[in-house]
Curated annotation (Swiss-Prot):
Official protein name in the record: Small ribosomal subunit protein bS6
GO MF annotations, alphabetized: small ribosomal subunit rRNA binding; structural constituent of ribosome
Region (Disordered): 99-131
CDD domains: bS6
Gene: rpsF
Family statement: Belongs to the bacterial ribosomal protein bS6 family.
GO cellular component entries: cytosolic small ribosomal subunit
Biased composition annotated in UniProt, kind: Acidic residues: 120-131
DNA repair is among the record's keywords: no
Source superkingdom: Bacteria
InterPro entries, sorted: Ribosomal_bS6 (IPR000529), Ribosomal_bS6_CS (IPR020815), Ribosomal_bS6_sf (IPR035980), Ribosomal_S6_plastid/chlpt (IPR020814), Transl_elong_EF1B/ribsomal_bS6 (IPR014717)
UniProtKB keywords: Ribonucleoprotein, Ribosomal protein, RNA-binding, rRNA-binding
Length: 131
């Protein structure tokens, strides 16, 4: 079986259906003896350019190992699902399991925000004790 990186963008009005879509696509892959190495739901993000007069979309990234028949079926499902506004399936040489740069950046921002909140709380606690 080959390794693939799949990214698809969902219409922003259909964001609540993304969890179900991921579940269906995951079941399709694992049902054919495939493996999901990485699954990332990036959430709603700004598009670089408008697509069908839309400026935002819900992004999902999958790194999978699956037979060609499953990939063909996924392409067909993406094509006929009106909620999927764009999709791309690329073959990669190796399984990618590490976090994507998008998720790494998001985690770093979250850590910085938590550190700042902790520092702010410590500063306010120190200021209260001096009074």
């Amino acid at each position: 079986m080959r390794h693939y990186e799949i990214i698809f963008m969902v219409h922003p009005d259909q964001s609540e259906q993304v969890a179900g879509m991921i579940e269906r696509y995951s079941a399709l892959i694992t049902g054919a003896e495939g493996q999901i190495h990485r699954l990332e739901d990036w959430g709603r993000r700004q598009l670089a350019y408008p697509i069908n007069k839309l400026h935002k979309a819900h992004y999902v990234l999958l790194n999978v190992e699956a037979p060609q028949e499953v990939i063909d079926e996924l392409e067909t499902v993406f094509r006929f699902n009106d909620a999927v506004i764009r999709s791309m399936i690329m073959r990669v040489k190796h399984a990618v399991t590490e976090a994507s740069p998008m998720v790494k950046a998001k985690d770093e921002r979250r850590e910085r925000r938590e550190d700042f909140a902790t520092e702010t709380n410590e500063d306010s606690d120190a200021g209260d004790s001096e009074e």
